[in-house]
A protein has these predicted regions:
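A SAM-dependent methyltransferase catalytic signature shared across enzymes that methylate proteins
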Residues: 176-191
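Conserved class I S-adenosyl-L-methionine
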Residues: 135-157
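Acceptor-substrate binding/catalytic loop of class I
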Residues: 158-175
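Adenine-nucleotide cofactor-binding loop residues
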Residues: 91-93, 111, 142
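Conserved N-terminal segment of class I S-adenosyl-L-methionine
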Residues: 1-100, 104, 118-121, 152, ...
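A short glycine-rich, Lys/Arg-flanked "PGG" loop and its adjoining helix->strand segment in the class I
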Residues: 119-133
Length: 237
């Protein structure tokens, strides 16, 4: 069977709830792990899918201990071949790991799918070691493609992308900063990554920036934000 055949991926989604991007690792998040190749450290990925990101972490850092939490049983079964994986709904707050176990906890396009992402990132503090980090990729609802639709009165959910029909929460740069500050984190890095935009969209950004407000150009260009954060000293226990 041709793995590029759309029907193949439709079958996987309908039968197993798996998507084509489940086996693509997130290079931008992995690049936020600042460790020497021979260092030993522990990583937990929330929503690890089929384990592609954890596998690439293990390839880059052979001494890393990799763990995953995944709600989809079929995906977790595949990921278990490369990591210690538990079938778990993170919002139920019952991770079976000891406190202060992990140097990194990863949320790769996960927080937008949660009913209470603030509560979840607070809950995960107990599993971070001293100087441990949260690493996350979060889609940007302020991207110019969404703003362009709103100007036409459209906010139509899609099968994937910024308006993915499974998204429960939406984030802008300011909302990400606000949530992690409220949760007790210090943001070490928060950078946008983008996709090409048209000349017309660039013109729209110029028009939006001419309006009164605090928005900056990057807030309309970033398709998603990649974050690295650690617990603030005043909230560590």
């Amino acid at each position: 069977m041709d793995l590029l055949d759309v029907d193949y991926w439709d079958v996987l989604e309908k039968k197993w709830g798996m998507h084509y991007f489940n086996d693509i690792y997130n290079v931008m998040l992995i690049d936020l792990i600042e460790e020497e190749k021979e260092n030993g450290f522990s990583v937990l990925e929330i929503g690890c899918d089929c384990g592609a990101t954890l596998l690439e972490i293990k390839n880059r850092f052979p001494k890393a201990e990799v763990y995953g939490s995944e709600i989809n049983v079929a995906s977790a079964g595949i990921a278990s071949h490369v990591a210690n994986v538990v079938v778990n709904n993170i919002e139920e707050e019952n991770l079976p790991f000891p406190e202060r176990k992990f140097d990194y906890i990863i949320f790769g396009d996960v927080l937008e799918h949660l009913h209470n992402p603030l509560k979840t990132v607070v809950y995960c503090q107990r599993f971070l070691r001293e100087n441990g980090h949260i690493i996350a990729s979060i889609p940007n609802i302020q991207h110019i493609s969404v703003m362009e639709g709103l100007m036409q009165g459209d906010f139509t959910y899609m099968e994937s992308g910024l308006l993915d029909k499974t998204h429960i929460h939406f984030f802008t740069y300011n909302e990400i900063v606000r949530m992690f500050h409220e949760a007790g984190y210090e943001i070490c890095s928060l950078k946008g990554s983008g996709v090409p935009i048209s000349d017309r969209q660039n013109e729209l950004i110029d028009q939006l920036l001419a309006l009164e407000g605090r928005a900056q150009r990057f807030m309309y260009i970033a398709f998603q934000y990649n974050l690295k954060a650690k617990m603030r000293k005043d909230v560590e226990s």
